[in-house]
């Protein structure tokens, strides 16, 4: 009853099963932006980041127009990955490679990013690599052992949030977070 840690789609929460979907081909049209980003000098050029929740925009076109009008260089989007419930909020991620279905499909997210890139705007996807929520369907004791969390119980739980702390000493955890 665990969600596939590398799954790219899930049922609509609160259900948590991974869903196998056809990997539709997406035709990116952001080549100009991708080339420009190679020349970007982060320490020498001004950056202006608009942080926003996907839930704040009913229509992604409104977000693109707003960002363009105010000349933001980048947008930081959250929540992006699938999370279990509204009580945990967007930081209760249980499917790190699956875009949340609450705001559309994976194709919708790609389209939004593509449109932002086409107006010259970079995109940051906000996520939490520091800790993960405590729930049976997720990474917690994934194979019956502390596979992702710190095996030392005194170092496994974040004292303020009550979430599991990743075991950064594990090569598997590093690979998972960097994949």
Q: Which residues does each predicted region cover?
A:
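Substrate-binding/active-site clefts of carbohydrate-active enzymes
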Residues: 31, 38-44, 53-58, 62-179
